[in-house]
């Protein structure tokens, strides 16, 4: 493809460039045809001639090259001049050859909109589905749409039989995806562009895209050849951005200037446009103005476009005729000074003139008015009609189209989703105006139909669908008996409030009247005191959940004013004794104990305040709701202890059972008849938690398995955890936990680990170490001063707080070992035995796992986790200055006398051995830092990735250097690996 610089301009290009003189070579006569990518024209043009040239001696061939070079330059110039025609006489001037079809490079937007319009046609549905559903980019959309167009053309004109007898190509295709309505596959092929007589054919890449619809995935499908634009590199993207900016500016210009822009882009020859393509004098003056704007324009994008298009960086003005020739505008009757004035005015006005039109026209009509040219010359019809063949169709020139119907993102109006729980929408409830002693009764009485008021026990029982054999008192709302007798009732409807989650609470779960033996003043079942429940209940945090925590239970005294209202039940602990902890109003009434749950006194806090409730034997636990519902309901009827708020459901449940057992120790005989909830079979094993406060919690003594005392402050988060996530796995050895008593037995067969000793009073010799995991460090004695023994480097923090070791379950080894260790992220990290140095005995080089046990003689090794993160500074608080590198790096040189804390010092190779990385062993620091050992044995050279650092130094270069240096008499022994530095040519021994 001939770029705008002209491929022939570079001396490196082969002699016959692809666009230049292809007519003379007969290689293009047969079509490369289908199949594997054949070597295109560019490979077959050059070889014979270049081989013959290579046989000649160098000087002669170079002279030929120069001569051929100038010949080619002249031929190129001649060809360009012949195309543009401005060097020939004006009589036999022939317009340049143009392709026979309209040059209309569609923008990608036009094609995409066409694809969207193709949705309406049934036979193109699959293609548009593929384009629009799979989120493709514009390039793929272009490929698919052109594939469809090519396929339709093939079908319309039948099998195309070329000269070589090549018909349609077809492939067997399978879809890569199991879920698309239309699979596709592509294959690529390099061919030549179809130009007449194959003159100037470009070698291009064709991509055949095959589609198959609706799971018919193995079909013979005919290919459609699709031109895939090559992926643009950064320079091309820059160029595209410039061109796009120019097109955007062009869209703002007036139509006459847009037309001149299009003519220049189409022809590329200013002379040709000036002499052949401008009909009227006004058009000629417009062209002059356009040239004036271009000559003074400082917009880089427009400059780039203009010079690229005319192929020249010094624009020539076609009205400046050669001196022996009558200029064209004079023959058209335009005076020279008119042209000069128009040119200078446009130069002064600049780019803005193209949009506003400037004064010469006199009217500032908008660019869309099509009578701009025809209003002044009515005869100029062919100019207007030529607007259809403009080479670029800008979206601004066309009527605004609606967004394709595909992209309307509105969800289709279908039936609302069937929710798995009853909602006021799915199960409308009859509304009644029941007076409840609720603080929200006003809001509920005036509630809209979307949020209906409290539901009475109506006969419309749609849900719950599960069988509800209920034995529970019938609650008649208006004239209730003072003590209602338990009569079986029909299941009550779902609550009328709108439920916003899966937490279903039915009214019949809550409305339940209990036989009460008590004084008359509290014989009326009153409401849960919602204002005070707010302070107590750890669960109902938000007002909305609190409001729907327990639907209003109907008290027998609802016809009159409530017997004990919210004011009567005082603050949580300071009410009358009959008003107990206000979890449920006066404890005599208790909160309505929800059916399958405990009918035990729910209001019975740790002090047994108020009379004791005896549940009638007739009130057996109902099988009311599925277990999930029970789980969520139990949340709402937990006892309100005066201690710390329980923070998770299992704590609350366990606390309720504890208080139950504490309060009535004699009720164990009665508990067979008492309907305490059987522990559901679906209860997870989370309730077997060890309840150990991280502070000063005592292990809890309780007879129940899952019990947690709500009176003890338990500082755990709300979700149950199996251990303190900050602690390492071995709780008995962790220094933070060692001072605490043994935790509560977490499961039943649990043997208690041996209790650790009290913290060290002085330094004791530790027993022979049995490390629980590799590299575990025992905490040093607390009695010692911080530098009392060598290598001690300050108190240990819990390792989970160290920023490098956030993962306590798979820790690093604590000591820097040689070789590759799995990081803490690897779940399969093997727990290796402690690895030592290469030194033979347990001498001074042994990397000690216990820093306080180190021999005084050995150089103290810094523990890795004690080194601060800025590794370039040695830790200032370690008593002896370390005389070794931070991590022992196996290099081919002996360890230097001073620590090499160079930022480039350590690199880990993916092969597993820690070896000096490229910069360390390279020319930057080789001479500067490393003391060379000339007589050292030379190990194998470290692998160097060629990709990351550019091409690695090739071994032959090293070999050459070695030969050169071994010939040198100065250096008799030279290590194989050592390279000369780039910055001075001195050898390593001189640097030493």
Swiss-Prot record:
Residues 551-610 are annotated as: 12 X 5 AA approximate tandem repeats of P-P-A-A-G. It holds the Pfam family EBV-NA3. It comes from the Viruses. Sequence repeats lie at residues 551-555, 556-560, 561-565, 566-570, 571-575, 576-580, 581-585, 586-590, 591-595, 596-600, 601-605, 606-610, 741-753, 754-766, 767-779. This is Epstein-Barr nuclear antigen 6. GO terms for cellular component: host cell nuclear matrix. InterPro entries: EBNA-3/4/6 (IPR007706). Interacts with host CTPB1; this interaction leads to gene repression, but also seems to interfere with the repressive function of CtBP pre-bound to DNA, leading to EBNA6 mediated up-regulation of many host genes. Interacts with host MYC; this interaction enhances MYC stability. Interacts (via N-terminus) with host RBPJ. Interacts (via N-terminus) with host histone H2AX; this interaction facilitates H2AX proteasomal degradation. Interacts with host TP73; this interaction inhibits TP73-mediated apoptotic pathway. Residues 595-611, 738-764, 772-781, 859-881 have a biased composition (Low complexity). Residues 130-159 are annotated as: Interaction with host PIM1. It comes from Epstein-Barr virus (strain B95-8) (HHV-4). Residues 479-495, 563-594, 882-899 have a biased composition (Pro residues). The lineage of its organism: Viruses, Duplodnaviria, Heunggongvirae, Peploviricota, Herviviricetes. Residues 741-779 are annotated as: 3 X 13 AA tandem repeats of P-[AP]-P-Q-A-P-Y-Q-G-Y-Q-E-P. Transmembrane segments: none annotated. GO terms for biological process: symbiont-mediated perturbation of host apoptosis; symbiont-mediated perturbation of host cell cycle G1/S transition checkpoint; viral latency. Keywords: G1/S host cell cycle checkpoint dysregulation by virus, Host nucleus, Host-virus interaction, Modulation of host cell apoptosis by virus, Modulation of host cell cycle by virus, Repeat, Transcription, Transcription regulation, Viral latency, Viral latency initiation and maintenance. Residues 1-70, 355-905, 931-954, 967-992 are annotated as: Disordered. Residues 381-391, 506-520 have a biased composition (Acidic residues). Residues 12-31, 715-724 have a biased composition (Basic and acidic residues). Residues 445-461, 659-676, 700-714, 845-857 have a biased composition (Polar residues). Plays an essential role for the activation and immortalization of human B-cells. Represses transcription of viral promoters TP1 and Cp through interaction with host RBPJ, and inhibits EBNA2-mediated activation of these promoters. Targets host chromatin through interactions with host transcription factors, especially RBPJ and IRF4. Alternatively, EBNA6 also regulates the transcription of the EBV oncogene LMP1 in a cell cycle-dependent manner. Belongs to the herpesviridae EBNA-6 family.
